[in-house]
Amino acid sequence: MQVIQIGSIAVLLKWLLLGAALFIGLAILKLWLRRTQEKILHKQVIDLFFNSLFFGFICWKGSLFIIDPVLVIKSPLSLLYFTGGTTGLVLAVVGSIIFYFFKANKSNITDRLILQSGFLYSFAVIGVYHLLATLLLEEQKLNHIISGLYTFAIVIFAFWKHQMVTQQRIFSSLILFSFLSLSLSFIQLSVERKIWFFSAQQWFFVALIIVSLIFWDKKSKS
């Protein structure tokens, strides 16, 4: 694993790339909103994403309580220097998704825009991350190239054919992406800790497939 030294703190390069992808994803989302939505909605949607990201960051740092509570009890300052790793990231993603939909449903944003914005932002972040990882990381090149190409193709389609980004197409894309990610994770023989034969990341994609199948044709308010 590649590490970047920032003062006295050593940070994995992949986390820095993810942080950069999160903010670049917001810029891409803002461009999409300008292209497709009324100006009055722009700030409301962007603020919702900022709040969701902050909540996800708190979940990521706080996940150490669940993953290694003994370490936190013995050394509370470990929360400043350590995270829950990939498992913690999965918990953070789940937490931020729940927060996003919970807050969005209390707003005047339509279900369609909530779903489209969340989908576009997620795929933009994934695409940017895999592009940066392909260029700057040494491991899992195949995963980064394939996942990056797939997600960027979806983002480009959403930009130029936004009226065709329907609920069914969104969940179909999520299902295909989840199967693709699962296949790549099995091919690369991940060494992550297993929970009932799967890693936390693999279980996330299994859950995403199930949720997508449930909501694929569920009616929503326009």
Where are these regions (language model features)?
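Hydrophobic, membrane-interfacing alpha helices
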Residues: M1-S222
